[in-house]
Amino acid sequence: MAVQQRRVSKSRKGMRRSHDHLTISNTVACNECGKALLPHRACRDCKTYRSIKLSIK
């Protein structure tokens, strides 16, 4: 196994991890009930997708 040659400072560790943050996903409003949901997903409350009623069992 590899062993580190030098200790990694807090600053260097933070700089390496600077791109690891999570991004906030965009939300859109449902056309029927107006509830916020992820794009390209069916609404769980009114069971519609792009104003088309779905028959979910």
Swiss-Prot record:
The keyword Repeat does not apply. GO terms for molecular function: structural constituent of ribosome. SUPFAM superfamilies: Zn-binding ribosomal proteins. Keywords: Ribonucleoprotein, Ribosomal protein. The keyword Ribonucleoprotein applies. GO terms for biological process: translation. InterPro entries: Ribosomal_bL32, Ribosomal_bL32_bact, Ribosomal_zn-bd. Pfam families: Ribosomal_L32p. GO terms for cellular component: large ribosomal subunit. It comes from the Bacteria. Belongs to the bacterial ribosomal protein bL32 family. HAMAP family: Ribosomal_bL32. This is Large ribosomal subunit protein bL32. The lineage of its organism: Bacteria, Bacillati, Mycoplasmatota, Mycoplasmoidales, Mycoplasmoidaceae. The gene is rpmF.
